[in-house]
A protein has these predicted regions:
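Short, surface-exposed "cap/lid" segments of acyl-processing enzymes
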Residues: 170, 177, 184, 326-353
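Unusually extended, aromatic-enriched hydrophobic runs near protein termini
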Residues: 129, 209-216, 324-327, 342, ...
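Sec-dependent signal peptide recognition
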Residues: 1-9
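N-terminal cap/lid segment of alpha/beta-hydrolase-fold proteins
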Residues: 268-336
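Acidic, low-complexity Ser/Thr/Gly/Pro-rich repeat segments typical of extracellular/periplasmic
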Residues: 17-296
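Hydrophobic h-region of N-terminal signal peptides that target proteins for export
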Residues: 9-16
């Protein structure tokens, strides 16, 4: 996904149409692309339980898999907020063509504080507050089944975001290059970045929606003030908070380390004798915790794990599996052989190793 700053400025501001601006609608207007009306991800799209609201995600192909995946994401009890490194989408008004497309900038180009596009850690409690992250940027000119036209897309690459941290993605008027002074921010967004009630510029915004938006954008307002960035120079922005998806995995690991090791069901026996290594196999009974039917190809087939009140995973079944070990035909180093673990998961064969 790549498009250059120069290309964007040429496409957005060639003078054949109105100056484009970010679509930022707090009125819940009935729109087939309403999912993108405040950008994504956004803390404006969190439910009361802290999970993302994906109810307006477009299902134009009526794909059962996509629809069920969106519902599962809302229902997943182990996650609030957004996953680190979630792609970012900002919708712009207007229609554009791709006639001037050129080579894009490298993601690291945007990881500086004077870039026209910036992904920023804005969390007051973060040790990395103010850090810029590299992003791979694209601009979609035409709509498809799931995305509207005139959609700016950014994918974080090369550096992971932290869990339980608030981030902002901003686009400044410098995206327009020589036409920077002609680019205007969305008025509702501009008021939020200045700490003003957006109802002053759009009376259709409810008091509740205005207050929520002011609270969501407060960390970005503080960051802009801290760094001396003029809110009038920010033409698009989204703010979101990451969750803690690793918490469940770490908890599982801690619980399982306390369990006794299951014994082998058979003795080790040699299965291969090659010039480079020998291979041995045995069988082992292991517990299974996912409900449903292997290999869980769709959410309807299960794959969830139930937990007891103390957070212990509930065993659903046991099965016997083959365990394979390969040993190099070289003298073992004083510190031992290096170990690589290969776990196939949801099916597969031991000799895939």
């Amino acid at each position: 996904m790549k498009i250059s700053t120069v290309v964007l400025s040429g496409i957005l501001l060639t003078g054949c149409y109105e100056t484009p601006e970010m679509v930022f609608d707090l009125t819940d207007e009935d729109d087939k692309w309403a999912f993108y009306n405040v950008g994504f991800p956004s803390d404006l799209r969190l439910l009361e339980n802290g999970r993302p609201d994906l109810s307006e995600f477009p299902h134009r192909l009526l794909s059962p898999l996509v629809m069920e995946a969106a519902r599962e994401a809302e229902r997943y009890e182990g996650m609030t907020g957004y996953a680190p490194d979630t792609p970012v989408y900002i919708r712009f008004s207007g229609d554009y063509t791709a006639e001037d497309l050129g080579l894009g900038e490298l993601p690291a180009y945007f990881a500086v504080d004077d870039a026209a596009i910036q992904l920023i850690d804005i969390d007051p409690d973060s040790a990395l507050r103010g850090t810029r992250y590299p992003v791979d940027v694209d601009f979609r000119f035409e709509e498809d089944e799931y995305r509207p036209a005139s959609l700016l897309e950014a994918l974080p690459v090369g550096a992971s975001q932290q869990e339980n941290t608030t981030y902002a993605f901003i686009v400044t008027r410098e995206i327009a290059g020589d036409y920077a002074s002609e680019l205007e921010p969305n008025k509702v967004l501009n008021y939020l970045l200045k700490g003003k009630n957006p109802r002053y510029v759009d009376w259709s915004v409810s008091s509740e929606a205005g207050a929520e938006a002011l609270a969501v954008y407060a960390p970005l307002r503080e960051q802009l003030a801290l760094e001396g960035i003029n809110p009038d120079d920010v033409v698009a922005a989204v703010v979101w908070t990451t969750g803690e998806p690793s918490k469940t995995a770490f908890r599982l690991g801690e619980v399982m380390q306390e369990w006794p090791l299951y014994p082998l069901q058979t003795e080790w026996h040699k299965t291969e004798d090659r010039p480079e290594y020998c291979a041995y196999e045995a069988t082992w009974t292991v517990p299974g915790f996912q409900k449903g039917w292997l290999p869980y190809p769709m959410p309807l087939w299960g794959g969830d794990i139930d937990y007891s009140d103390d957070g212990t995973p509930i065993e659903q079944y046991q099965r016997t599996v083959t365990v394979g070990v390969t040993i190099p035909r070289t003298p073992m180093p004083a510190e031992g052989y290096p170990v690589m673990l290969f776990h196939h998961g949801t099916g597969g064969w031991t000799d895939n190793l």
